[in-house]
Amino acid sequence: MSCSEKRGGGYKGELKERNHHVLEGEEDEEEEEKTSSVTQPNSSLTAPQLTIDGNLLVDPKLLFIGSKIGEGAHGKVYQGRYGDRIVAIKVLHRGSTTEERASLENRFIREVNMMSRVKHENLVKFFGACKDPLMVIVTELLPGMSLRKYLVGIRPNQLDLRVALNFSIDIARAMECLHANGIIHRDLKPDNLLLTANQKSVKLADFGLAREESVTEMMTAETGTYRWMAPELYSTVTLRQGEKKHYNNKVDVYSFGIVLWELLTNRMPFEGMSNLQAAYAAAFKQERPSLPEDISPDLAFIIQSCWVEDPNMRPSFSQIIRMLNAFLFTLPPPSPSVLESDTNEPAATSNGTITEFSARARGKFAFLRQLFTAKRTKNSQ
């Protein structure tokens, strides 16, 4: 678990009053980016009662909220302090009806339980949570910014290819960890990816839409962001309230393909389209963002494998990591100035070493391509 200290207590009156005031703010300005949330009728009566392990609860008396640093459809994020730690504090909305409150509370408990059981260097660290009088999640505060903000800030320039690949490997490793623990994120996009202080690594945040994979792989269609969502998440027909839908963890692989394309091009997916137009183009016309003419065939293959229509044809994140690393080793060595500024990246000391790595990488990459090509051929017969 990310947090093993046992904590408890109640909010100070001043903090409680302030937090309640916080929740009365304006609605999410990016709601247009989202699909409608589906709440099952009588969910509070039919859903099993979820609980949070007492070891995961923070002591509210040690929790102080500062300035707002982010906002989403389900809550707001603040910079704050927990004891002597500078932290990020996510305050979630309670809901206005009994059914909505029950649904949001279950979502909150699931998010807390999932965050507490996965630990990885590319996942935002979870410190704890409290449920009353407000639903709060406490995590590490990254001094960097979201990947979305960073990419917008450097436009019209693009990321250095090595930087883009290292970011993508960070993301793939985080997703590999989630999938290994039976968790589907369902909302992988640059807004939920945060840069570290030195802007050399990326961490995945926001488990608000994450779900545990069930044996039947039947889940309720919920909120997500169209431009990065796998088509099977919003299907060819609108789901009626409470209907179930089949999908698996390969929805995250599709989203990763879009994010990888974005890292390489620094453009908005489905540029020039509205959100609904983007959804229609992806689901009904099988359209995908245009690949650059000068993109490496190997990188094009990785991206196209991720966003292929048939989820079963998409690679796993373990395979994606192998392919990205293999391609990374085929690149020429970085310039001396890059090596001096990046102490995290090992420098090769001889051309022979680089050549040896490149040869191995090309062989491994060729094998993976043959594997996926054979799988596609077999599937189409």
Whereabouts are the PLM-identified features?
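A conserved loop-to-beta-strand element in the N-lobe of protein kinase catalytic cores
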Residues: 132-140, 148-149
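Short beta-strand micro-motifs within the conserved protein kinase catalytic domain, predominantly
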Residues: 125-133
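Protein kinase glycine-rich loop
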Residues: 66-77
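Activation segment signature within eukaryotic-like protein kinase domains
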Residues: 167-168
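Regulatory alphaC helix of protein kinase catalytic domains
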Residues: 108, 112-113
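Glycine-rich ATP phosphate-binding loop
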Residues: 78-96
